[in-house]
Amino acid sequence: MKKLLSLIIIGGALVAGCNSQTTQEKTSAIVKQNGVQEIVKPTLLTKQMFLDQIMDYETNPSEWIYKGDMPSLIDFYADWCRPCRITSPILEELAQEYAGKIKVYKVDVQAEQELAAVFGIQSIPSFLYIPKDDTPVMSSGIAQTPEATKDMFRKQIDEILLNKTN
């Protein structure tokens, strides 16, 4: 009986050890700025947050007036979408990499159907690149591999949001 109990305890410890990262570590990035560690991750947007922080399309339906203080990337996704699940950790890494330069947001198209309709989202994942002082650009889909997808995002962030040319 003692051997069985010991095996169960050791097995449980092994399983716990194989998954030692906490959910916080998996879903967020930590950036050190001015000696202070700050957690940077994509922000989940609701309709009201979008109206308050990005653009109030109810007040100004025919004119884009961006309310943000820096360029932004918005990921329109769904939990059941495989390409969206591939994209999610990539955007978390890029939120850390570009911290202080851009903001990364996520919109769940199932929960926020009005936002998806306003932007004509017909396929997911779709991405809205919002430069600080220019016209937003919409794109959709991902590349064939996660690495190529990350490179695609970097290129679009640099060119569209940060106005960098190679």
What are these model-derived regions, one by one?
Residues 45-70:
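A short beta-strand-turn-helix
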Residues 123, 128-166:
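Non-catalytic, surface beta->alpha helical segment in thiol-disulfide oxidoreductase systems
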Residues 69-72, 76-80, 123:
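Short pre-active-site segment immediately N-terminal to redox-active cysteine/selenocysteine motifs
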Residues 45, 49, 72-75, 86, ...:
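Extracytoplasmic/secreted proteins, especially bacterial periplasmic and envelope-associated proteins
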Residues 1-51, 158-166:
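N-terminal targeting signals for export/organelle localization
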Residues 79-86, 126:
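C-type cytochrome heme c attachment motif
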Residues 71, 113, 119-130:
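Structural micro-motif
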Residues 76-78, 87-95, 99-114, 121:
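Thiol-based oxidoreductase modules, predominantly thioredoxin-like and allied folds used
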